[in-house]
Amino acid sequence: MEISQLLPKFKIEKIIKEWLEEDIPSFDYGGCVVGSDEKVAHLLGKQNGVFSGSIFFQEIFNQLGCKVIWFIKDGESFSMTHGPEKNKPQVLAHVIGPVRNILIGERLSLNILSRSCGITTQGYNVKKLVDGDNEQQQQQPWKGKIAGTRKTTPGFRLVEKLALLTAGLDTHRMDLSSMIMLKDNHIWACGNITNTVKNARSVGGFSLKIEVECRNQNEAIEAIEAGADIVMLDNFNPQDLQTVSTYLKQHYPHITLEASGGITSATIIQYAIPTIDIISMGNLTQGVPHIDISLKIQKQ
């Protein structure tokens, strides 16, 4: 199964068209200078990473009348040491077409890929930690899911969520319409957890799950007994998380438990315990280092 098939073609076409129009609102001065002779450009991975975002790159150059020849697939690793020559960038793809069109798509395509690959690389490395591929591995592999959050870049969410999926992670909810998440402000506005969940169920019906953010065991119990499907245990330390989640699973085995709040790659192992089903991390999409990727026209 190809993850990129999640995105309808018309949606991709619309997004890319808007981004291209944003970059060239009127004259293409640089393109006029170089002309329209056919050239070949190499897409180069200049540091270690895990690749993602090909569907966006491909659509950019489709709209610009260029051909892309791929040498890597989404989810595959690339590095500077690939092949017989050391410290040489790995060639990820060739782009063939009118030189002015290649240059139109250059910066937009690289902005997307460097961000997308950065998120996928970060997610892949975090997933390895809980999969037991390192020295910190716990005695038994954790069977839960690592998820992102809604802390995404406005207008760029599809790229970032697809990058998480490519890393083997969960997107969490895509938007406010995907699942009902009741946080502290919702609860304070409604007065208590029970009323908040009741109101949410009356508008969400049977088809939408309800998740409630809880700060302690009593709040979690109230949320469960009010009919929540998922309880987020927010900003718990590992010891308290172990105690509370164990109690909740013993008394309410049907409930899905999520740990969230301040969890990083340095601490995730402490939160990956059997009674936790989901670990969500905002830093999977916020503050992620970009991967250095370039597109170079080849001299003839």
UniProtKB/Swiss-Prot annotation:
Protein name, UniProt field: Nicotinate-nucleotide pyrophosphorylase [carboxylating]
Instruction: Provide the residue span(s) of the region labelled Important for hexamer formation.
Output: 5-9
Q: Which GO terms describe its biological process?
A: NAD biosynthetic process; quinolinate catabolic process
Role, per record: Involved in the catabolism of quinolinic acid (QA).
Entry similarity comment:
Belongs to the NadC/ModD family.
Q: Tell me its EC number(s), please.
A: 2.4.2.19
Q: How does it assemble?
A: Hexamer formed by 3 homodimers.
Functional pathway: Cofactor biosynthesis; NAD(+) biosynthesis; nicotinate D-ribonucleotide from quinolinate: step 1/1
Q: Which InterPro entries match?
A: Aldolase_TIM, NadC, NadC/ModD, Nicotinate_pribotase-like_C, Quinolinate_PRibosylTase_N_sf, Quinolinate_PRibosylTrfase_C, Quinolinate_PRibosylTrfase_N
Q: Where does quinolinate bind?
A: R107, R150, K151, H172, R173, K183, E213, D234, S260, G261, G262, G282
Q: Which domain of life is it from?
A: Eukaryota
Keyword check for Zinc-finger:
no
CDD domains associated with the record:
QPRTase
Q: What does the record give as the reaction this protein catalyses? A: nicotinate beta-D-ribonucleotide + CO2 + diphosphate = quinolinate + 5-phospho-alpha-D-ribose 1-diphosphate + 2 H(+)
